[in-house]
Amino acid sequence: MRVILSGGGTGGHIYPALALAEVIKQHEPDAEFLYVGSERGVEANIVPKTGMAFKQLAVQGFSRSLSLHNIKTVQLFLKAVKVSKKIIKEFKPDVVIGTGGYVAGAVVYAAQRMNIPTVIHEQNSVAGVTNKFLARGATKIGVAFEVAKQQFPSEKVVLVGNPRAQQVAQLKSTFSWQTIGLRDDKATVLIFGGSQGAPAINLAVIDAIPEFNERSYQVVIVTGPKRYDNVLDLLRERNIEAADNIRILPYIDNMPNVLKQTDAIVSRAGATSIAEITALGIPSILIPSLHVTGDHQTKNAQSLVDVGAAINITESDLNGQSLIAAVDTLLLDENVSDKMAAQATKVGMPDAGERLYQLILQAMANKKD
């Protein structure tokens, strides 16, 4: 089996593709992969480290206003399609899979023009621009949220979940809180604003630390590497010291390992976070980012709130007191946390990679028919 994967720009498009590749390898050890990414996206740093063959295309997104930028965007897209056709001709894939981002638009569109089976995967509750564009020509479409199905042709779309969920669920964690000086027998909340950190979350945490110091549970705060020094500076300016039950870290290398030992999480509501949280059945406090296309994080969060699997705090309502109140609700009331964990588990799809793999086989079978 020969597979071209394409997705780029953010980790939310890349990690599901890499997780899917792991599942395919489990079924087909001789499978060969080629990942086609963008020159500017983070995939250029992430994919080569996995040992997967990697090629780059020059693409860029559209501006909301009419401009010369958009003319160049179209020119780059057409050139990227031409280069993609050459790559496809040389690699001879059985299927081409797109997981979002502008680069996937060029690669999957080229494959569609060459009559090669294509599968696209939508991680969010609101379909992205690229996947909307590719939907008509796609052989099959997998989505991570039930609500996303209505945005695609009904005869093609299947609810499969996010392959990242299966990757996390299958992981055997050896992590201990003792490695950062905490105890394994105490309830622990992880507060994480994403790989770059979230200033709004960090500021709320700073306000909350004096009260967190008095709690029986443990608090692990991940600031983001670029914001770590700023958080420490603000704590010093305000004469706030963190007690022994609190740890402040710039980043965590292996988040899935840590999540398996976490009793509650405070995070943004990105697709990857939602997949991980539900796969592991972790009660969560979600603070959707306002700076995303189509406000999809709010809708992602609402999908968990609606089934009682999460608490949602809007950024405008986020402060030290609202954060403490929400964490107390999860970690000081076992009935609440147990119910939320059960509901998160119900909506989680720990076999998402397997579901998407089966959809890919269907797409390939359609071609043979």
Curated annotation (Swiss-Prot):
GO terms for molecular function: undecaprenyldiphospho-muramoylpentapeptide beta-N-acetylglucosaminyltransferase activity. Pathway: Cell wall biogenesis; peptidoglycan biosynthesis. It comes from the Bacteria. GO terms for biological process: carbohydrate metabolic process; cell division; cell wall organization; lipid glycosylation; peptidoglycan biosynthetic process; regulation of cell shape. UDP-N-acetyl-alpha-D-glucosamine binds at T10, G11, G12, N124, S195, I252, Q297. GO terms for cellular component: plasma membrane. Its EC number is 2.4.1.227. InterPro entries: GlcNAc_MurG, Glyco_trans_28_C, GlycoTrans_28_N. The keyword Secreted does not apply. It is found in: Cell membrane. Cell wall formation. Catalyzes the transfer of a GlcNAc subunit on undecaprenyl-pyrophosphoryl-MurNAc-pentapeptide (lipid intermediate I) to form undecaprenyl-pyrophosphoryl-MurNAc-(pentapeptide)GlcNAc (lipid intermediate II). Belongs to the glycosyltransferase 28 family. MurG subfamily. This is UDP-N-acetylglucosamine--N-acetylmuramyl-(pentapeptide) pyrophosphoryl-undecaprenol N-acetylglucosamine transferase.
